[in-house]
Amino acid sequence: IGHFSIVEDNTVIGSGCTLESHVIIKSGTTLGDDNRVFDGAILGGLPQHVHIPEQPGRVMIGYGNTIRENVTIHRALVTEHATIIGDNCLLMVGSHVAHDCHVGNHVIVTNNALLAGHVHVDDRAYISGAAGIHQFCRVGTLAMVGGQAHLVQDVPPYVTVDGLSSLVVGLNKIGLRRAGHDQATIHDLMAAYRIIYRSGLRWAEVLEQLRTRFPTGPAALFYEFLSTTARGIVSERRTPPGATIKLRDTVVAEPQQPQVRVKFG
């Protein structure tokens, strides 16, 4: 436990944990084994809510997590509930996890990203810098959210959300390969993706297609996720037909006449 750190009563800190300087572990917080908490982090603060209960819930943090400088994690609103961080997560500088959030395993939340109350982030998701996730939204497994994205709907598993438009731009193929998924699995995921975003089917038909064509395997998670969404899902960013990326200005400047200096006298 580093210099000037504070550990309040009613806390549990597992073996092998490291608290750097100026860390505050507030009442109602449980840390599993082998967590490292960097300078200035505050874990277990009261929920930011207009009606703070006298006995809020807990913060439950698993094992092997890295919690960087000035991260804040707040307790749940209801006594029997908890804000949960799984195992082997990385919460980077200044990120915030609000009350009643559930963060899975191997999740990365980068600098200054904000998870509002009741947000669920599934395993191996990646939240880029300064992204903001609205209350009660869910981010699916192996989804990647781009920097400065602002999300008010659920992000399906395996997809990438562009930070500028806050819209889906395709599968997170790099993340899928890093997670060990082979090309056949990625092919199935791409087929399911096209059903969701490019088939033109009605919502009930999309769900039926996913249920019947992909009953097992990673692609089956699309049906499970979409059939339980309460907020709807993030739309796809569509490029107009025939559009291309302008690599440089195509306007050709008219050749300039050479300047002739005339000497008088």
Regions found by a protein language model. Name each.
Residues D34, G40, H51, G64, ...:
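Terminal amphipathic alpha-helical/low-complexity segments used for targeting or macromolecular assembly
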